[in-house]
UniProtKB/Swiss-Prot annotation:
Gene assigned in the entry: thrB
Pfam families, alphabetized: APH
Cited PANTHER family: AMINOGLYCOSIDE PHOSPHOTRANSFERASE DOMAIN-CONTAINING PROTEIN, AMINOGLYCOSIDE PHOSPHOTRANSFERASE DOMAIN-CONTAINING PROTEIN-RELATED
InterPro entries the UniProt entry points to: Aminoglycoside_PTrfase (IPR002575), Homoserine_kinase_II (IPR005280), Kinase-like_dom_sf (IPR011009), Pseudomonas-type_ThrB (IPR050249)
GO biological process, one term: threonine biosynthetic process
GO MF annotation list: ATP binding; homoserine kinase activity
Enzyme class name: transferase
Family to which this protein belongs: Belongs to the pseudomonas-type ThrB family.
Disulfide bonds: none
UniProt protein name: Homoserine kinase
Gene3D superfamilies reported in the protein's UniProt record: 3.90.1200.10, Phosphorylase Kinase, domain 1
EC number: 2.7.1.39
Length: 327
């Protein structure tokens, strides 16, 4: 979450008058994240989150995100629920941006994920995948392999400002992943596509909620697992933690076993996931709006993760032996 668009107090008061959520007591911008402008609202009826969707998010996609949250919540997944205004609408406009109010979830995200946290997110991800099977709406993944070339084009001219040689490193990896190696015949379904630690809340050792479905889409289920391996299983010194990976994968496969093809493809999917976040971080790093209340994330973190994944020989390198499982 982040703040790119500020909101005047009188404009916010007029906006909130359309909702039955009590009187506004205070509000503040939330600086974490990189995609949209988010505010914590404190009203006489509790806490809510106000999101203003910025330009990277297409307005036509917003009904998908909002309906998905409702579907998952109805299916027993702890996630925010959209709040409708007095006319039953969950999507509105504020400060020239599409806007929505969602319920507030208790819990905190883990700044230093433990093995227990990794097991929790593995289980939660699998349950979300299963709950999404009967969600009728569809949305293609605009940031899968076909979407990486435009990101590279947007950043290549200045990539070497971040690290000398970065442009050529990215070009080589992108060419490889575009060469026909990317799988298309693995089990597909609804994926979160951005399940980083700051998008999972815990109370103690238990997952209390999954947030931020801005990138949710239909794609390879194992790709979502690969994203989590990169996001949860590396230490602050960039070393891969096999114990965390084993916990995450074991918890996931207890709920939804990976078939043999998914297992074989996981290292390649993790390479692609690393490149995808490296590219979006690089574009954001080079294009932070002046004065924005935002903390751009370091693209070099994902250079190191990509280099690791390039050298993974198979799923055993993630600490597990689950060959023969069936979906």
């Amino acid at each position: 979450m982040a703040v790119y668009t500020d909101v005047a107090a009188d404009e916010l008061a007029d906006f909130l008058s359309r909702y039955d959520i009590g009187d506004l007591l205070s509000y503040k911008g939330i600086a974490e994240g990189v995609e949209n402008s988010n505010f914590l609202l404190h009203t006489s009826r509790g806490y809510f989150i106000l999101t203003l969707y910025e330009k990277r998010v297409a307005r036509d996609d917003l009904p998908f995100f909002l309906s998905l949250m409702t579907h998952l919540a109805d299916s027993g997944i702890n996630c925010p629920q959209p709040v409708a205004d007095r006319e039953g609408r969950t999507l509105a406009t504020l400060a020239g941006r599409p806007a929505a109010i969602i319920s507030f979830l208790d819990g905190v995200w883990p700044r230093k994920p433990s093995v227990v946290h990794c097991a929790g997110v593995g289980q939660a991800l699998a349950k979300m995948h299963l709950a999404g099977r009967d969600f009728a709406m569809k949305r293609a993944n605009a940031l899968s392999v076909a979407g990486w070339r435009p990101l590279f084009a947007a950043a290549e001219a200045r990539a070497d400002e971040v690290q000398p040689g970065l442009r050529d490193f990215l070009a080589a990896e992108l060419s490889y992943l575009e060469s026909g190696v990317w799988p298309s015949d693995l089990p597909q379904g609804l994926i979160h596509a951005d399940l980083f630690p700051d998008n999972v809340f815990f109370i103690g050792d238990d997952v209390s909620g999954i947030i931020d479905f801005t990138f949710a889409c239909n794609d390879l289920l194992a790709y979502d697992v690969a994203i989590c391996l990169n996001a949860w299983c590396f230490e602050a010194d960039h070393a891969f933690n096999v114990t965390k990976a084993r916990a995450l994968l074991s918890a996931y496969t207890r709920e939804r076993p990976l078939d043999a093809a998914e297992q074989a493809a996981l290292p390649l999917l993790a390479r692609g996931a690393a490149l995808r976040f490296l590219l979006t971080r690089l574009v954001d790093w080079l294009n932070v709006p002046e004065g924005a209340l935002v903390k751009p994330k370091d693209p070099m973190e994902y250079v190191r993760k990509l280099r690791f994944q390039q050298n993974v020989a198979g799923i055993r390198d993630y600490g597990v032996e689950i060959a023969g499982a069936v979906a």
